[in-house]
Swiss-Prot record:
Organism superkingdom: Bacteria
Listed Gene3D superfamilies: 1.20.120.1820, HscB, C-terminal domain (1.20.1280.20)
UniProt entry tagged with the keyword Chaperone: yes
Matches recorded under NCBIfam families: PRK04976.1
This protein's name: Chaperone protein TorD
């Protein structure tokens, strides 16, 4: 079981790092070209094999297909990113937990909690990401770190605690605000790529928590 779990954790970390990259910064021309490659389309097809993710993967693929016909695709998609995630007006979907859970304030209690968690686990945020620590990209990256770090554990009791920590992080730091974030993305993202990504992130996180909770029961 341990070897199977290590493979699963590597796959989970890969998906979390990928999701983090979508909300980290605007996609470049090279990034967009990669999304049209057979390698990435195979990766997305693999995700779609999971029934709970298939609908949201389909919406993301449809948006990527529309992107191929979009005039000035990179510039327009960068504008979508800016309008959704970098503006502070009412027609945006700011990717910070504090906005949704701390009276709409930036850099609130969730950011402080994330700073403490990152410090406790020795995780450093990329220097060029000048954002509060409760940014979605940072939270997803941290979850990937937790998943891959669990592979260093050999004892089942410690492993169960590590899996529980991941489940608790999802409950306490992501599911408290991600549904509202995904809803706002859907409301304000006319083209639909980032709203599809947000809904897919939510669906994957919900499914991952369910999977973690089952694994915790098995390791007891």
């Amino acid at each position: 079981m341990m070897q199977e779990l290590k493979i699963l954790n590597e796959k989970r970390a890969e998906i979390y790092w990928w999701l983090s990259s979508l909300f980290f910064k605007e996609l470049s021309e090279q990034d967009i070209a990669r999304y049209h490659s057979a390698e990435v389309r195979t990766f997305l097809s693999g995700l779609a094999d999971e029934q709970s993710l298939s609908r949201e993967v389909k919406h993301l693929v449809e948006a990527l297909n529309r992107l191929q016909d979009r005039q000035d695709a990179q510039l327009e998609l960068a504008a979508d990113f800016c309008d959704l995630f970098l503006k502070s007006d009412r027609d945006s979907a700011l990717p910070y937990a504090s906005v949704y859970t701390d009276q709409g304030l930036l850099n609130g209690k969730p950011a402080q909690q994330m700073r403490e968690l990152l410090s406790a686990h020795g995780v450093k945020v990329e220097q060029n990401l000048n954002e509060p620590e409760d940014h979605l990209a940072i939270q997803l990256d941290f979850l990937a770190h937790l998943a891959i770090s669990a592979n260093q554990i050999e004892h089942s009791a410690q492993l169960s605690l590590a899996l529980q920590a991941q489940s608790d992080f999802i409950s306490q730091h992501l599911l408290t605000w991600l549904p509202a974030f995904a809803e706002r993305c859907t409301q304000f993202d006319a083209f639909g790529l980032y709203s599809a990504a947000a809904r897919l992130a939510l669906a994957f996180i919900q499914q991952d928590k369910h999977c973690l909770d089952e694994l915790i029961q098995e390791t007891h």
